[in-house]
């Protein structure tokens, strides 16, 4: 009796998928698109910064030039093209440079958040002082070092100029009085809507 021979099925050789020449996964198209979009947003955030804050951003000179140019352009289409260019320059940054920019922007946003909250408090307090004499009593109780006579004079004059439709001189001065009494920093805007254009650039 002839011995039975077992047929061995030859399995196909599975070739290892080569990620790339360097042995790591190449980013997918969707990942690259997300990264490009994130850099574009970062560039837009730089363009939107107040000029004093922009000076503190750790930017290479070519990026700084591109951002300043984008801030100067007022034409919608021209600005859109320049923002795209800012995004291209952003993509040339190293990871460390990008990380440094993000860190600086996050710090600036924290400062802005605190300053905005303080600004809103001053505005609310001013409205309360103009609306009720009792508000001044409460304010002075909380801020005993404030100049009482000056505060009363400013409130009286601000009410009068509002009734007469005059320019809001004392209205603005009352803002400054509240800011000084409340210990707010000098970086606060003088009044909502009364600040200068933050996007004016140096000559």
Curated annotation (Swiss-Prot):
Keywords for the protein's UniProt record, in alphabetical order: Cytoplasm, Ribosome biogenesis, RNA-binding, rRNA-binding
InterPro entries registered for this protein in UniProt: DarP (IPR006839), DarP_sf (IPR023153)
Pfam families to which the protein is assigned, alphabetical: DarP
Superkingdom of origin organism: Bacteria
Location(s) in or outside the cell: Cytoplasm
Any one Gene Ontology cellular component term annotated for this protein: cytosol
Acidic residues bias (residue ranges): 186-203
Keyword Repeat: no
Primary localization: cytoplasm
Gene Ontology biological process terms, A to Z: assembly of large subunit precursor of preribosome
Region (Disordered): 1-31, 183-203
Gene3D superfamilies named in the record: PSPTO4464-like domains
GO molecular function: ribosome binding; rRNA binding
Disulfide partners: none
Transmembrane listed as a keyword: no
Family: Belongs to the DarP family.
PANTHER family for the chain: UPF0307 PROTEIN YJGA
Its biological purpose: Member of a network of 50S ribosomal subunit biogenesis factors which assembles along the 30S-50S interface, preventing incorrect 23S rRNA structures from forming. Promotes peptidyl transferase center (PTC) maturation.
The protein's name: Dual-action ribosomal maturation protein DarP
Organism for this UniProt entry: Burkholderia cenocepacia (strain ATCC BAA-245 / DSM 16553 / LMG 16656 / NCTC 13227 / J2315 / CF5610) (Burkholderia cepacia (strain J2315))
Lineage, highest ranks first: Bacteria, Pseudomonadati, Pseudomonadota, Betaproteobacteria, Burkholderiales
């Amino acid at each position: 009796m002839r011995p039975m021979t077992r047929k061995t099925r030859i399995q196909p050789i599975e070739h290892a998928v080569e990620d790339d020449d360097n042995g790591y996964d190449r980013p997918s198209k969707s990942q690259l698109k997300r990264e490009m979009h994130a850099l574009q947003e970062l560039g837009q955030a730089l363009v939107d910064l107040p000029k004093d804050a922009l000076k503190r951003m750790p930017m290479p000179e070519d990026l700084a030039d591109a951002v300043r140019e984008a801030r100067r352009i007022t034409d919608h289409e021209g600005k859109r093209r320049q923002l795209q260019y800012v995004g291209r320059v952003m993509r040339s940054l190293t990871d460390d440079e990008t990380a440094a920019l993000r860190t600086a922007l996050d710090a600036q946003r924290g400062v802005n958040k605190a300053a905005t909250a303080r600004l809103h408090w001053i505005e609310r307090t001013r409205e309360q002082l103009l609306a009720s004499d009792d508000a001044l009593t409460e304010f002075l109780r909380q801020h005993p070092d404030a100049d009482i006579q000056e505060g009363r004079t400013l409130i009286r004059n601000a009410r009068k100029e509002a009734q007469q439709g005059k320019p809001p001189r004392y209205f603005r001065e009352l803002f400054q009085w509240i800011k000084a009494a409340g210990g707010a920093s000098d970086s606060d805007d003088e009044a909502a809507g009364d600040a200068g254009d933050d996007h004016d650039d140096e000559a």
